[in-house]
Amino acid sequence: MERERSNFFFLFLFCSWVSMAQPTLSLSSDGQALLSLKRPSPSLFSSWDPQDQTPCSWYGITCSADNRVISVSIPDTFLNLSSIPDLSSLSSLQFLNLSSTNLSGPIPPSFGKLTHLRLLDLSSNSLSGPIPSELGRLSTLQFLILNANKLSGSIPSQISNLFALQVLCLQDNLLNGSIPSSFGSLVSLQQFRLGGNTNLGGPIPAQLGFLKNLTTLGFAASGLSGSIPSTFGNLVNLQTLALYDTEISGTIPPQLGLCSELRNLYLHMNKLTGSIPKELGKLQKITSLLLWGNSLSGVIPPEISNCSSLVVFDVSANDLTGDIPGDLGKLVWLEQLQLSDNMFTGQIPWELSNCSSLIALQLDKNKLSGSIPSQIGNLKSLQSFFLWENSISGTIPSSFGNCTDLVALDLSRNKLTGRIPEELFSLKRLSKLLLLGNSLSGGLPKSVAKCQSLVRLRVGENQLSGQIPKEIGELQNLVFLDLYMNHFSGGLPYEISNITVLELLDVHNNYITGDIPAQLGNLVNLEQLDLSRNSFTGNIPLSFGNLSYLNKLILNNNLLTGQIPKSIKNLQKLTLLDLSYNSLSGEIPQELGQVTSLTINLDLSYNTFTGNIPETFSDLTQLQSLDLSSNSLHGDIKVLGSLTSLASLNISCNNFSGPIPSTPFFKTISTTSYLQNTNLCHSLDGITCSSHTGQNNGVKSPKIVALTAVILASITIAILAAWLLILRNNHLYKTSQNSSSSPSTAEDFSYPWTFIPFQKLGITVNNIVTSLTDENVIGKGCSGIVYKAEIPNGDIVAVKKLWKTKDNNEEGESTIDSFAAEIQILGNIRHRNIVKLLGYCSNKSVKLLLYNYFPNGNLQQLLQGNRNLDWETRYKIAIGAAQGLAYLHHDCVPAILHRDVKCNNILLDSKYEAILADFGLAKLMMNSPNYHNAMSRVAGSYGYIAPEYGYTMNITEKSDVYSYGVVLLEILSGRSAVEPQIGDGLHIVEWVKKKMGTFEPALSVLDVKLQGLPDQIVQEMLQTLGIAMFCVNPSPVERPTMKEVVTLLMEVKCSPEEWGKTSQPLIKPSSS
């Protein structure tokens, strides 16, 4: 009995266990396969219960009547799978949608076993590797959507076996090769998109013209070349053809006129030539026709007016000629007509006023003549009208006052006459009124105050007269006020000071009199103030010290008196100060030397200043141009020797005395720079005047100068020869002393050292060598390892240990001497934007370079950190690096190539000034075995190497320019040259080009931390973006020099004439 009870108890436990285990064991194989999708994220999909018998009730899952999974649709979830699991057991699967699920790794070839699959959507992930050819087995597949991944390799030709395929989306990947011509067999295909694969090349197969079911064909932003196949005329169902930003050339095939369903034709930014086919006029349903940015010629065919549905017509930036067809006035749905930057002639057809839906009319940069038709006032929806740079004459029609939606009106650079119609100022939305460079006359009407929406009022270079109306001070939103080069008279109304948002005030070249209103000091946002070439009297207002954002102050050619106010020291953003041709007196204040931001120009000439040059001028190390001529200054000029960035100097017609500094700059400038300073003299050391030399207007005779130069050169050569001989003998002696010792290791520090400091250093070789430990490593690069070494006085220096160049036994005396000579050249370089080489020490095995230490790190660390780096700091770093590089290229003889310009080699001091490091070291390392196996390092670092190096193997100044352009793009975008998150792994140059080739605005390239800034700053950044793209031009010949780059960058903040231009920006965004 007891045994029976025991058996019953164990039977009960077994049955209980079976009943509990049964749900897990009964989950179907389909369910088991699906669970592998959530393995990295178990908390996902609470409804996916492994206790269920089937997954048919799970989220995103659909089953057939026999409980087989036929659909898996879980887009926009965070699966976070590093590889897609094997799902081939889902043999009934028809729909698989894993888009935007954070997948990576390759596409499994086993997907080719899912023979019932009708939809495969893996888009918007990080999938890599090739597209498996096995997908060509999916005979029932209708939708293959793999866009926005990192797929590489060529497009498998086996895809052409998918006869049921309707949608093929492969855009925005890294595919290469060409489009298989066999794709012409995909007769069911309706959408075919390949855009954004920049490495995809070759011609467009003519066979694609047989895919008569196509509605969308997109190959934009790729490397496709050749011509547009004429067979595309067979695509009678095509609605969108996007072939912009490619290498496509040739003519536009007239057969496209047969594509009767076409709505969008995007052929902009290509290399198309020839004329616009009149056959395009047959496209009755087309709404967007974008042909801008090609080399099209001929006229606009009048047949275009038959495109009755047209909304956007953009043929700007071509070579089109002839008249603008009046028949375009028939396009009643037209909203954007963009014909700018061509060679159109004739008059503006009045018929355009019939385009009642017109919002934007851009006719700028042509050769149009005649007057502006008064009927333009019929365009009640018009928001922008650009007509600048033509030859339009006559008056400005008062009918513009009827265009009540008008926001921007630019009629600059024409031949307009008459008055500015008061009706313009009744426009409640007008924010930009640009009338520069015409022959307008009369006064500026008081009614200007009615236009409260005005942000930019630019009427310079006309013949306007009378007083500037005080009512202008009521324009509370005005940012730019240009009244320069007119005939305005009377005083400058102090009411202008009420416009507290004003950033630019330019009234130069008028007849304005009286004192400069002290109230202008209330314009705390002012950045540029130009009152030059008027008849202002009195003192420079002390209140100008309040203008903390001012970067240009131009007051020359007036009747100003008194002294420079000491409050000038508060203008710490000032880059240009011109006070020349006035009657200013007294001493130049020491405070002026404290304005260390002065970089472009300081001009105090033709005044009556007395006293010495302030000692504080030694801090103006960024200043490029200084003019102190025609004053009554005296004393020595040794302080000018500290101005290491000077490119232009004039101190003539003063009473200076003593020696002329012996810096390289003073050795190269013309004697006219310091004429009529009878007590100036030349000097060998810059401290004392040379003996036995005559003085004539502060300049020695040419014979004496030549003789001095010869003597100096001879002494230098003799000293150098003696030094090299001693070095050679010491080396031979040390070598013989060590010849009997055991062979040294690769890092042997026991060899005798040679230590050459380039300035006084309180450090010994032992201090340096003992610091070369792993704990002190602060960086590794192409040229060597960098250590931090502490000097006994507490200072810190950076020590770079160069990679070994050759085997110790092979390194001869000539190699040592050559290295010493190269280092001597680098040690003589002095520039505020170049790291100073303090000295070097070497022995038979090791070479060490000593530099200043910069605790703020480098630009790469700054950009990739979490700091909100503002535009001013970025611009400061960009221009500092450019100035340093320009110095190496243009001011060093012979020129020095950097060879490795990158963010890691741009160090930052405590004030975030850019300091170039590692200049010229690549040349020293070219014999290194480390480089022998990676020669590309000699040309720079990955991501920064100029494209021509791949086929020329030559390095030039233009190679450095390309690398600098990449750095500039990194500064603007906040991204690295190559990183996974840049547009699917694209190089930053290609990423920017891709952005500019889509419908995204240029602003989308900029760092998100730079979004939402004032319009003027946005324009500065866009101009800088244009300069960067100029630098990374694929053709070295087309790139600027670094000196030109510096000038262009200076002009970003130097050109008030270009501020606020309402025309197309430097890089034109795609139209839409």
Swiss-Prot record:
Annotated signal peptide: 1-21
Glycan-carrying positions:
80, 97, 102, 176, 213, 306, 354, 402, 498, 546, 650, 655
Q: Where are the transmembrane segments?
A: 707-727
> Which molecular function GO terms apply here?
ATP binding; peptide receptor activity; protein serine kinase activity; protein serine/threonine kinase activity
Task: Topology check: give the Extracellular ranges.
Answer: 22-706
Query: Which regions does the record annotate with the repeat LRR?
Result: 66-89, 90-113, 114-138, 140-162, 164-185, 187-211, 212-234, 235-259, 260-283, 285-307, 308-331, 332-355, 356-379, 381-402, 403-427, 429-451, 452-475, 477-499, 500-523, 524-546, 548-571, 572-595, 597-619, 620-642, 643-667
Q: Which residues form the Protein kinase domain?
A: 772-1067
Q: In which tissues is it expressed?
A: Expressed in roots and hypocotyls.
Which residues are annotated as modified residue Phosphotyrosine in the UniProt record? 851, 887, 944, 951
Q: List the disulfide bonds.
A: 56-63
Q: How is it modified after translation?
A: Phosphorylated and ubiquitinated upon interaction with RGF1, thus leading to activation a subsequent degradation.
Site residues (Essential for autophosphorylation activity), renumbered to this chain: 800
Question: Phosphothreonine: which positions carry it?
Answer: 764, 952
The residues exposed to the Cytoplasmic compartment are 728-1072
Q: What does this protein do?
A: Together with RGI1, RGI2, RGI3 and RGI4, acts as a receptor of RGF1, a peptide hormone that maintains the postembryonic root stem cell niche by regulating the expression levels and patterns of the transcription factor PLETHORA (PLT). Links RGF1 signal with its downstream components.
Q: How does it assemble?
A: Binds to RGF1; this interaction triggers the formation of heterodimers with SERK1.
Q: What is this protein called?
A: LRR receptor-like serine/threonine-protein kinase RGI5
Source organism of this protein record: Arabidopsis thaliana
Biological classification of the source: Eukaryota, Viridiplantae, Streptophyta, Embryophyta, Tracheophyta
